[in-house]
């Protein structure tokens, strides 16, 4: 099992657009082979800070997710508004 924790900080003026774009990623990602969990969370004190929790059955499934059209669309729409992106790829002990 492979899990990713992603912290995304967007420009404050892009926060609502980011929330919508992230919501639009959920269903197509959950339909991908190997996806177990895919959830976004929004910080309660900073509405321009988001966290993503991804759980995949393999590294290959996780890596394939990054090449999908819906991820490409997301990055095209939000790329210029992303101020910081932290990605932590983990595996269970």
Locate predicted features:
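Short N-terminal helix-initiation segments at or just after the protein's N-terminus
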Residues: 1, 30-34, 85-88
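Residue-level recognition of specific faces of alpha-helices
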Residues: 2, 21, 37-40, 74
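Short, well-ordered beta-strand segments in beta-rich or mixed alpha/beta enzyme
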Residues: 2-9, 39-66, 88
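A generic structural signal for short beta-strands and their flanking turns/coil linkers
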Residues: 4, 34-36, 69, 83
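Residues at secondary-structure transition points
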Residues: 9, 13-16, 20, 47, ...
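Short amphipathic alpha-helical segments
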Residues: 14-35, 70, 78
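Short, low-complexity, polar/charged sequence segments that are solvent-exposed and flexible
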Residues: 26-27, 57-60, 70-73, 84
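Glycine-rich beta-strand-turn "strand-cap" elements at beta-sheet edges
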Residues: 40-48, 74-93
């Amino acid at each position: 099992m492979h899990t990713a924790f992603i912290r995304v900080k967007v420009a404050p003026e892009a926060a609502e657009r980011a929330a919508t774009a992230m919501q639009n990623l959920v269903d197509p990602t959950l339909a991908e082979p190997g996806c177990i969990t895919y959830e976004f969370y929004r910080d309660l004190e900073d509405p321009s800070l988001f966290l993503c929790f991804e759980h995949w059955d393999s590294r290959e499934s996780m890596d394939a997710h990054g090449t999908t059209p819906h991820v490409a669309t997301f990055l095209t729409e939000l790329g210029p508004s992303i101020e910081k992106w932290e990605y932590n790829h983990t595996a269970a002990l």
